[in-house]
Swiss-Prot record:
One of its GO terms (molecular function) is serine-type endopeptidase inhibitor activity. It comes from Ascaris suum (Pig roundworm). This is Chymotrypsin/elastase isoinhibitor 1. The record marks L31, M32 as: Reactive bond. GO terms for cellular component: extracellular region. Defends the organism against the host's proteinases. Belongs to the serine protease inhibitor-like (TIL domain-containing) family. Transmembrane segments: none annotated. It comes from the Eukaryota. InterPro entries: Ser_inhib-like_sf, TIL_dom. Keywords: Disulfide bond, Protease inhibitor, Secreted, Serine protease inhibitor. SUPFAM superfamilies: Serine protease inhibitors (SSF57567). Disulfide bonds join C5-C38, C14-C33, C17-C29, C21-C60, C40-C54. It is found in: Secreted.
Amino acid sequence: GQESCGPNEVWTECTGCEMKCGPDENTPCPLMCRRPSCECSPGRGMRRTNDGKCIPASQCPEH
């Protein structure tokens, strides 16, 4: 079943790669499905912080 997702995360059947805050923000993603999970969706402008939170890219700390 669907696990409970954290703030800003979305349950996704076909997860791609998440994007982290920081210099690797523009790393291209492989177009493959990973296992279903809670995704911090880059398509919605979200980024994963180093401590695992999912926040809007505009709130990323300056690097």
